[in-house]
């Protein structure tokens, strides 16, 4: 990947984690999980659900729905404006 490539997955996960936005996650088996993303890596999500931690493997995730609209490209456009 080039240096300027935007990683949408990491941007979404970072924004909901940093802003403590509640997410609803649907797994491939249809199970629904609602909570906060505390951390993530290439393979897993660590969530806080009802005061308890759950580690979820990304390959089991079907859909992630943030509790509010995200502004994904504001940080990237601010960086581009500063570089010019």
UniProtKB/Swiss-Prot annotation:
A GO molecular-function annotation: RNA binding
Protein's GO biological process: regulation of DNA-templated transcription; regulation of RNA stability; regulation of translation, ncRNA-mediated
Gene3D superfamilies documented for this protein: 2.30.30.100
Chain ranges of the Sm domain: 10-70
A cellular-component GO term for this protein: cytosol
Pfam families: Hfq
PROSITE patterns in the record: SM (PS52002)
Functional description taken from the UniProt entry: RNA chaperone that binds small regulatory RNA (sRNAs) and mRNAs to facilitate mRNA translational regulation in response to envelope stress, environmental stress and changes in metabolite concentrations. Also binds with high specificity to tRNAs.
Subunit annotation: Homohexamer.
NCBIfam families (alphabetical): Hfq, PRK00395.1
Family note: Belongs to the Hfq family.
Name of this chain's protein: RNA-binding protein Hfq
Species in which this protein is naturally found: Natranaerobius thermophilus (strain ATCC BAA-1301 / DSM 18059 / JW/NM-WN-LF)
Gene: hfq
């Amino acid at each position: 990947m080039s240096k300027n490539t935007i990683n949408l997955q990491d941007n979404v996960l970072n924004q909901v984690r940093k802003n403590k936005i509640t997410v609803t996650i649907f797994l491939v088996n249809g199970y629904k999980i609602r909570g906060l993303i505390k951390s993530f890596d290439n393979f897993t999500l660590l969530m806080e659900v009802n005061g308890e931690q759950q580690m979820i493997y990304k390959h089991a995730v079907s859909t992630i729905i943030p509790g509010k609209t995200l502004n994904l490209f504001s940080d990237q456009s601010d960086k581009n404006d500063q570089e010019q």
